[in-house]
């Protein structure tokens, strides 16, 4: 029994040894993926930096660099250290294995390495990718653990190379990691000295390339006869194209040089390589083959290029002229003709003037650009002249606002008006929402002290009360022009009626006259009000041009609002000298400078005093709003005085006696708003000549003939100071005459 037991134990031990060896080969361990290549190369030069030294082992998944992993990270990983090169022979060529240790900087973020080997004077490049397998994350204790790559084979003897080891993911890119330069050993050191590979081999002293039309002639001095070369091979290709093409050259027996002709090659930069039939001789050069210019190439090419360009240009010019002509016909077809339709429309105007004119108050943002202000002025004049409305606009009533105070005038107009039109824009949306954010605890907004915010919140409160009391909400209208969008309407105005101008112009016209018209009387008013013909009138043409100018401004500067207000840096309010502003039309406008009083501008006590003179519902509105401006008013009062802005800007008239009439006097033959119309800029020359009628002064009631105004000299009002006692001191000065519109 004893010998049997000993034999069984021996067989079990032998089986365990063989099975354990197979499992070890399957697992691989450190450098397991390079085992096959290392065995093929005899296992020479393998590193044992991680073996039998008591350090922690690391395993990697080895592959080439084709599977792309994002190498960009958020942390810095330092350069590897202690780079060593292990060289050995593999299939009668040089093979190397690179060894290194990781840097402690960023080692916890390390996920792998890219090992890039490149010949110093060639374009050849080899790359290996090592992805960390175990452990998943390294700690600083691994900084002394050695790491090694798979063998890089097929290298040349006595050739300069450099290796670059790039850890990833790192915030540094490949170019920020330093290369390690080395030179491969001679053939005699890696192979036996008697090996044929290590014997001296021949290289041609001269390799010349000449161009012969579309052909290249390659000449070189061939090897002596005792070398036994019978053929030479020319490998050539364009620099950035695919594999080499091959041309076989037979050695000339009677000369010392051999020539080969490469026929019908494409012009470009070529790489030419000379190889003998035993593949031991190799010499490379670059040559740029220039294009061939035949005697007829220039004229024929010029004709072939010029004629199509001329034809295309002619068609493009003709198409442009036709489109322009058609556009002019569509827009201005009715401006120069005395048609029966125009006569009927002109005859119908006096009948329309006999009807009650609905009172309209316009509220808008003073924080948008000057082009938007021009649109507001032209829109107000259009409502008054074309739509038969009695318009209240702060730009037309500076003197009255100065006498009554801004908020008193504002509340009065809101209460008196039959309709309140809020022109919504990007600026209104932005600053109204900023005001709401400030009430929720956010930092102070940049729109404090702007009267249009007070107007918007007052209208919103009236809208809310009308909703609660089940009153008619048609008084409140929110409009936006086509250079804005419906999203520019503040959320507090959602209950109002919304119109897009000028697309919904007929609906707005019907809305404004809905209280004065019955179904039987509707034909008295013009029925041809639409987006396509509103510019037939003088006021409509001015509005059309102002909208076009705003479109052109937005096309030139799409981010004009963001540049101006986002982020908006607030600056302390202080009294400043009046600054002259200039509209695009050439009219010089001044802002009205008001002296800050203790009971002025967004102060709750003053609001109560002002509203007590008005209606009782206004009192409730202001108490409910309580715009949170007490702190702001104290800051402003500490600053001394401030600039009180009207809803937009103030337009100054020529003389005190010629000041624009307020909104309560619209029966005159000349509307007061005509003094502030912008010029029709942005049109073509012929369109400007056609539309020059916009410069004439016409009767809003259709009476009288149009005569161009002749302005010889004009007096403009310099900014006055409104004191707390509501006394307005106006100073006049002589200014230079302004050319007529």
Curated annotation (Swiss-Prot):
Residues 357-510 form the SEFIR domain. Feedback inhibitor of fibroblast growth factor mediated Ras-MAPK signaling and ERK activation. May inhibit FGF-induced FGFR1 tyrosine phosphorylation. Inhibits TGFB-induced epithelial-to-mesenchymal transition in lens epithelial cells. Residues 323-741 are cytoplasmic. It comes from the Eukaryota. Residues 688-708 are annotated as: Disordered. This is Interleukin-17 receptor D. Residues 688-703 have a biased composition (Low complexity). It is a single-pass type I membrane protein. PROSITE patterns: SEFIR (PS51534). The keyword Transmembrane applies. It is found in: Membrane. Residues 1-26 form the signal peptide. Residues 27-301 are extracellular. One of its GO terms (cellular component) is membrane. Pfam families: IL17R_D_N (PF16742), SEFIR (PF08357).
């Amino acid at each position: 029994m004893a010998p049997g037991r000993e034999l069984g134990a021996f067989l079990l031990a032998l089986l365990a040894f063989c099975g354990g060896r197979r499992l070890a080969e399957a697992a691989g361990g450190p450098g397991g993926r390079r085992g096959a290549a290392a065995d093929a190369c005899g296992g020479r030069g393998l590193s044992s930096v991680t073996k039998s030294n008591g350090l922690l082992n690391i395993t990697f998944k080895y592959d080439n660099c084709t599977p792309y992993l994002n190498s960009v990270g958020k942390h810095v990983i330092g350069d590897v250290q202690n780079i060593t090169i292990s060289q050995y022979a593999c299939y009668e060529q040089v093979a190397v294995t690179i060894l290194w240790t990781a840097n402690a900087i960023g080692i916890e973020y390390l996920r792998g390495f890219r090992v890039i080997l490149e010949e110093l004077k060639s374009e050849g490049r080899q790359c290996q990718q090592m992805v960390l397998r175990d452990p998943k994350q390294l700690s600083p204790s691994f900084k002394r653990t050695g790491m090694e790559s798979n063998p890089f084979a097929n290298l040349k003897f006595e050739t300069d190379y450099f290796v670059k080891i790039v850890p990833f993911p790192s915030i540094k890119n490949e170019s920020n990691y330093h290369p390690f330069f080395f030179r491969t050993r001679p053939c005699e050191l890696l192979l036996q000295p008697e090996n044929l590979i290590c014997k001296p081999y021949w290289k041609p002293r001269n390799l010349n390339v000449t161009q012969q039309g579309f052909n290249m002639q390659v000449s070189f001095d061939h090897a002596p006869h005792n070398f036994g070369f019978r053929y030479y091979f020319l490998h050539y290709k364009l620099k950035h194209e695919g594999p080499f093409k091959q041309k076989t050259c037979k050695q000339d027996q009677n000369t010392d040089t051999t020539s080969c002709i490469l026929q019908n090659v494409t012009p470009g930069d070529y790489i030419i390589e000379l190889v003998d039939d035993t593949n031991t001789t190799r010499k490379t050069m670059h040559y740029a083959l220039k294009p061939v210019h035949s005697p007829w190439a220039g004229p024929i090419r010029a004709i072939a290029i010029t004629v199509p360009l001329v034809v295309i240009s002619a068609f493009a010019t003709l198409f442009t002229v036709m489109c322009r002509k058609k556009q002019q016909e569509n827009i201005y077809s009715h401006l120069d003709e005395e048609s029966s339709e125009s006569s009927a429309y002109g005859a119908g105007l006096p009948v329309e003037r006999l009807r009650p004119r609905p009172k309209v108050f316009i509220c808008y943002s003073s924080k948008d650009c000057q082009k938007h202000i021009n649109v507001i002025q032209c829109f107000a004049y259009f409502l008054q002249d074309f739509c038969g409305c009695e318009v209240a606009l702060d730009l037309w009533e500076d003197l009255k606002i100065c006498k009554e105070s801004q908020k008193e005038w504002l509340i009065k107009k809101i209460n008196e008006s039959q309709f309140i039109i809020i022109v919504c824009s990007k600026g209104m949306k932005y600053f109204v929402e900023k005001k709401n954010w400030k009430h929720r605890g956010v930092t102070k907004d940049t729109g404090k002290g702007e009267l249009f915010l007070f107007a918007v919140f007052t209208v919103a409160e009236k809208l809310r009360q009308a909703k609660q009391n089940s009153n008619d909400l048609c008084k409140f209208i929110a409009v936006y022009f086509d250079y804005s969008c419906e999203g520019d309407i503040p959320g507090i105005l959602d209950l109002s009626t919304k119109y897009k101008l000028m697309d919904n112009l007929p609906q707005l016209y019907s809305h404004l006259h809905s209280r004065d018209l019955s179904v039987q009387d509707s034909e008295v008013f013009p029925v041809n009000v639409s987006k396509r013909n509103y510019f037939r009138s003088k006021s409509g043409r001015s509005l059309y041009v102002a909208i076009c100018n705003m479109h052109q401004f937005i096309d030139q500067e799409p981010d004009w609002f963001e540049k101006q207000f986002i982020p908006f840096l607030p600056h302390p309010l202080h009294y400043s000298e009046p600054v002259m502003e200039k509209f695009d039309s050439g009219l010089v406008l001044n802002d009205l400078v008001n002296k800050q009083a203790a009971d002025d501008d967004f102060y709750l006590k003053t609001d109560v005093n002002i509203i007590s003179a008005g209606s009782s519902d206004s009192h409730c509105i202001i108490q409910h709003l309580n715009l949170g401006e007490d702190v702001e008013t104290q800051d402003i009062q500490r600053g001394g005085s401030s600039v009180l802005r009207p809803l937009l800007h103030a337009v100054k008239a020529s003389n005190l006696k010629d000041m624009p009439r307020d909104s309560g006097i619209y029966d005159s033959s000349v509307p007061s708003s005509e003094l502030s119309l912008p010029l029709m800029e942005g049109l073509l020359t012929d369109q400007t000549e056609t539309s020059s009628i916009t410069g004439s002064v016409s009767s809003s009631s259709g009476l009288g003939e149009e005569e161009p105004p002749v302005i010889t000299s004009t007096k403009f009002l310099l900014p006055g100071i409104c004191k707390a006692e509501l006394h307005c001191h106006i100073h006049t000065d002589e200014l230079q005459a302004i050319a007529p519109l």
